Every structure is written in structure tokens, then in C-alpha cells.
């Protein structure tokens, strides 16, 4: 397991964690170093995780395209990118084209204590396309959890990993609930 300190100190790490749930059903979580620190917890709670330190929105788009070519895109895709580089409207539109009209794109707002902006494109896209995009507002949620972060104010301590996992889990589970008759075990999702 990679700790948040390892993720922060050892950029270059990539974590691909299979989901603990049903194959092909698990939400896919694509992220950068923030998600990298929480990858193990996310995979234990039903997500297929692909996280890489310093991953850019463009690299995330390339990953989605490669998975589409392989026919390996689930119905729900969670994207948590933009800690280092802002996500643009163009990036989001490219993701939507790759995912098509039947999948849901869940966008996580990045939290940067030193830079309180950079979530505008994500928020606008979620408002404009509520049927296809769901906002997961980590930026707002994280403001109340100073103790969740290491000294850089961005990467997660264990308590932050739990809060981050809970937020993503609750958002994805609310989307999955109707498909599995409300049974979290059938959807491969456990409580955080």
C-alpha cells in the first residue's frame, strides 16, 4: 500500500487497483497524486482506480480513449485531475465525447489551499450538463479539514484519505443505487 507520504515524496508512482466489486460494474476512478494516496481505500470500497502522480487532464483523456478502444469503460467514471494543471472546458468536452451519452462523468473539484480558484470549468460543465456530469465538490468539503492534509496542504493524511474516499463513494453509490436494488454488496460497494 502506498501512503500519502509515499505518493507525495515519490512522484512517478502509478497505482492501478482492481475494484473489490463486480467486474465491469465498478466505477472507474482516474486521478493524480491526491487520489494516489487514497487509491487503496478507494479500491477497497468498490472503485477501479488508476492514479498517477502529476497526471494532467490530457493524460487522463488519453487513458479514457485507450480504455474506450478496449471496450473497458464502465457506466460511471470519476475524474479527479487538475491539482497541478487546471481542467478546461475543452478537456471536459473531450471526456464527454469519449464516454458517450450513456455514461456518467463525475468530476472532482481539486483542492489547493494556496490557490482557491481553478474549479470554474468543472462547476460550469456540471451546471450545463446535469444529465451527464455530476460534481463531486472536494474543494468545498476539504476547506473544513485542515488536519486531513500534510504540510503541503494538498496531499492526504490517513484521515483525509477517509474523508476523500467517503465523498467519492457516496457520490458514486448514489448513482449506482437504483441499478442494484439498493444492495451495496451486489454493487461491490461497502460503507466507509
Please provide the spans of the model-predicted regions.
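Long, well-ordered alpha-helical scaffolding segments within enzyme catalytic domains
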Residues: 94-99, 124
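Conserved beta-strand termini and adjacent loop/short-helix elements that scaffold enzyme active sites
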Residues: 30, 50-52, 108, 136-141
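A short helix->loop->beta-strand "cap" motif at the edges of active sites that frequently abuts
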Residues: 100-105
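N-terminal secretory targeting modules
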Residues: 1-28, 70-73, 167-169, 173-192
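Conserved SGNH/GDSL esterase-like catalytic core that processes O-acyl groups on lipids
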Residues: 21-94, 112-120
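Catalytic His-Asp segment of secreted/periplasmic serine-dependent ester chemistry enzymes
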Residues: 116-192
